[in-house]
Regions:
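Hydrophobic/aromatic-enriched cytosolic interaction surfaces used to assemble or bind macromolecules
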Residues: 1-255
Length: 255
């Protein structure tokens, strides 16, 4: 039996709903409601719209996993060329949005692609958008230990993983890799580490979250490198249509 949504501790008022947007589908989470839909399923779209309109929801936050972001240091950012930042990362430059990190160091430019707020008829709710990378970056900025060298952070999802690298606590690298199994995960991980001239014996891989479904990945990595984990209530496993995503929950990293 697959894992179900694991409810984290929350400090957010119950009037807020979260919608996780992926490439081919999205997922609503609000109180006891947990439902996924494609962007073309009219029956599900109507069902989700009714849930949001007929409930006490007064704000909806969209968390975007649906396209690769472009990450630009604030001092080099030019708001006038947002579309150009995305041209090398993604084929979609529709509904471009941007975040700025909590530490005011980087701008995150991304395509929202589908404007679900209009599709779902959310004209009375307060709407906000954030890219998944921005949440991840803000989270790590709050928990990273002081280090004199490179720090490697990895978050595994079903079918992909993300790697972030810091040098002396300064962010320097992010990428997402699609993978089939733990062997592909190992290949891409050490390909990146070797490009940064990392010493397998000296440096350590830090996994964001520790979940039983990814034990094979952890065990394989531990044969070639030291590993560690960040574990706390800020992480959830979401099971969307048989796929598992490790999500930084906004409830725990925002006021």
């Amino acid at each position: 039996m697959g894992l179900q949504f694991l409810m984290p501790k929350t400090k957010t008022k119950i009037s807020k709903a979260f919608i996780y947007q992926f490439e081919s589908f999205f997922h609503l989470h609000f109180l006891s409601e947990s439902i996924s839909s494609s962007y073309t399923d009219r029956v599900k779209l109507l069902e989700i719209s009714k849930i949001l309109i007929n409930s006490a929801v007064n704000s909806v936050e969209f968390i975007h996993f649906n396209s690769a972001p472009s990450i630009i240091p604030v001092k080099f950012y030019d708001k006038g060329i947002k579309a150009k930042y995305l041209e090398t990362n993604t084929g979609s430059t529709n509904n471009i949005d941007e975040d700025i990190s909590a530490d005011q160091k980087i701008n995150v430019v991304y395509s929202k692609n589908k404007d679900l707020s209009k599709t779902l008829g959310l004209d009375k709710q307060k709407i906000s958008h954030v890219n998944h990378f921005t949440q991840l970056y803000n989270y790590l900025s709050g928990v990273i230990d002081k280090s004199d060298g490179l720090s490697f952070f990895i978050k595994i999802n079903s079918g992909s993983f993300e790697i972030m690298i810091y040098n002396k606590n300064e962010f320097i690298f992010f990428n997402t890799f699609k993978i089939i199994d733990e062997n592909e995960f190992l290949y891409y991980t050490f390909f990146v580490l070797e490009n940064f001239q990392s010493s397998i014996k000296k440096d350590k891989i830090i996994f964001i979250g520790k979940h039983e479904i990814f034990d094979k990945y952890y065990n394989l990595a531990s044969k070639y490198s030291r590993i560690d984990f960040i574990e706390d209530d800020a992480h959830s496993i979401l099971n969307f249509e048989e796929k598992f995503f490790s999500v930084i929950n906004a409830n725990n990293i925002r006021d």
